[in-house]
From Swiss-Prot:
GO terms for cellular component: cytoplasm. This is GTPase Obg. It is an enzyme of class 3 (hydrolase). The gene is obg. InterPro entries: G_OBG (IPR031167), GTP-bd (IPR006073), GTP-bd_Obg/CgtA (IPR014100), GTP1-OBG_CS (IPR006074), GTP1_OBG_dom (IPR006169), GTP1_OBG_dom_sf (IPR036726), OBG_GTPase (IPR045086), P-loop_NTPase (IPR027417). An essential GTPase which binds GTP, GDP and possibly (p)ppGpp with moderate affinity, with high nucleotide exchange rates and a fairly low GTP hydrolysis rate. Plays a role in control of the cell cycle, stress response, ribosome biogenesis and in those bacteria that undergo differentiation, in morphogenesis control. It comes from Cupriavidus necator (strain ATCC 17699 / DSM 428 / KCTC 22496 / NCIMB 10442 / H16 / Stanier 337). CDD domains: Obg (cd01898). Belongs to the TRAFAC class OBG-HflX-like GTPase superfamily. OBG GTPase family. Its EC number is 3.6.5.-. Mg(2+) binds at residues 173, 193. It is found in: Cytoplasm.
Length: 365
């Protein structure tokens, strides 16, 4: 299935039904009172996050989604039926924005999360509501309210723990296929990857994490060059970036250090928060480098690149160094989760302390 990560749709809720201006008519009751029922509520348009859906392709071709109108009220105190709601199932990770106002309506980050995109109009009142001691035969009724109508932009930001950065043909697809269940297209030419790939890495029976591979970046990507700029947003939810560098490019005129710096510059120009994410350097294709030259080449790269963060040396093709990298990633992600859990627990601790102080004050009084 083709991966579609952006779509524009129109959500149109149903109009409320009109109230009825009706009077009771029965034999021997010539002056029956008002009995006009209310109109039904218009149907609403909802979105629900579904982890079984991976793309927005359905919304690329079906752009208008219209809920039913509420039925009009009738006599004999009959209320109109409510219009049927419609539910749009979207991938987890979908960001929904109102195109007219720029308001972010929802960020679907959890399976089953439900949000209203367009609310149906309220039904109008029948003349039954207008009866009073001075107006025994009211002819007033209220029309139903129109339903909401919204133009919406859908953006899919995949939910991954780790994101892969790198130039085209750096070996990202080979790496993700070696460590996970993902099977992206792998070939010896640039831009083999044309859309994001997700892979689940199982460390053991109980622990796993998700890796996202996006098309390779080139210089000028932040301004729209190449393919990768279209998919950089998929890295915004990750907790760790792996910058994969081809340590032994086929073209000897290519400088890996210059390419690595170009990637980082594009990242910074695109999004400062993405640039500030934890980032590890992964030097790939060691199998192509003679063993007696590896240490010197790695040392030279780090020196010229002026890198002070974590460095891993791997061969995505043979698997050399991949196991150590996987366990390091697992430890890093566990540390992040522990910090988040501790941060969430801190307010509870402060609240307990305040309650304890209040109890002590009451005891002294």
């Amino acid at each position: 299935m083709k991966f579609i990560d952006e779509a524009r749709i129109e959500a149109i809720a149903g109009n409320g039904g009109n109230g009825s201006a009706s009077f009771r008519r029965e034999k021997f009751v010539p002056f029956g009172g008002p009995d006009g029922g209310d109109g039904g509520r218009g149907g609403s348009v909802f979105a629900v996050a579904d982890r079984n859906i991976n793309t927005l392709i359905d919304f690329r071709y079906a752009r208008k989604h219209v809920a039913r109108n509420g039925e009009n009220g009738r006599g004999s105190d009959c209320y109109g039926a409510a219009g049927e709601d419609i539910t749009l199932r979207m991938p987890v990770g979908t960001l929904i924005t109102d195109m007219d106002t720029g308001e972010v309506i929802a960020d679907l980050t959890e399976h089953g999360q439900r949000v209203c995109l367009a609310e149906g109009g309220m039904g109008g009142w029948g003349n039954l509501h207008f009866k009073s001691s001075t107006n025994r035969a009211p002819r007033q009724q209220v029309d139903g309210k129109p339903g909401e109508r919204r133009m919406l932009k859908l953006e899919l930001k995949v939910l991954a723990d780790v994101g892969l950065l790198g130039m085209p043909n750096a070996g990202k697809s080979t790496f993700i296929s070696h460590i996970s269940n993902a099977r992206p297209k792998v070939a010896d030419y640039p831009f083999t990857t044309l859309h994001p790939n997700l892979g689940v890495v199982r460390v053991d029976h109980e622990q796993s994490f998700v890796v996202a591979d996006i098309p390779g970046l080139i210089e000028g990507a932040a301004e729209g060059a190449g393919l990768g700029h279209q998919f950089l947003r998929h890295l915004q939810r990750t907790g760790l970036l792996l910058h994969i560098v081809d340590l032994a490019p086929f073209d000897e005129a290519v400088d890996p250090v210059a390419e690595a710096k170009a990637i980082v510059n594009e990242l910074k120009k695109y999004d400062e928060t993405l640039y500030d994410k934890p980032r590890w350097l992964v030097l790939n294709k060691l199998d192509v480098v003679p063993e007696d030259e590896r240490a010197a080449r790695v040392k030279d790269f780090i020196k010229r690149y002026k890198w002070k963060g974590p460095v891993f040396q791997i061969s995505a093709l043979t698997g050399e160094g991949c196991r150590e990298l996987i366990y390091a990633i697992k430890d890093h992600l566990q540390a992040i989760k522990a910090e988040e859990a501790a941060a969430l627990a801190e307010p509870d601790i402060r609240l307990d302390e305040r309650l304890h102080n209040v109890d002590q004050g009451q005891g002294e009084a």
